[in-house]
Amino acid sequence: MASFFSFLLGEKKKTANVAKERLQIILAHERSGRNSHEPDYLPALQRDLIAVIAKYININPNDIKLNLERQENLDVLEVKIELPDK
């Protein structure tokens, strides 16, 4: 209830609380960026794609390449599949 009145009355946050919030934001940003080059799900996604494509086409698993690139605020997943000759 006190925080509600603080909000209404415009009580300023203490410097320690502001610093703590900023640190939490920085840590969250660093943690999310740590594995941004290759997320944990990428190898599993590649295995699943190989399994699905293998149902329809006889393909070498090495002929499927996944690449994740970051372009500004956009993640782009590129999938290259080298299909066998008929």
Curated annotation (Swiss-Prot):
It comes from the Bacteria. This is Cell division topological specificity factor. It comes from Polaromonas naphthalenivorans (strain CJ2). The keyword Transcription regulation does not apply. The keyword Lyase does not apply. Belongs to the MinE family. NCBIfam families: minE (TIGR01215), PRK00296.1 (NF001422), PRK13989.1 (NF010595). Gene3D superfamilies: Cell division topological specificity factor MinE. InterPro entries: MinE, MinE_sf. One of its GO terms (biological process) is regulation of division septum assembly. Keywords: Cell cycle, Cell division. The lineage of its organism: Bacteria, Pseudomonadati, Pseudomonadota, Betaproteobacteria, Burkholderiales. Prevents the cell division inhibition by proteins MinC and MinD at internal division sites while permitting inhibition at polar sites. This ensures cell division at the proper site by restricting the formation of a division septum at the midpoint of the long axis of the cell.
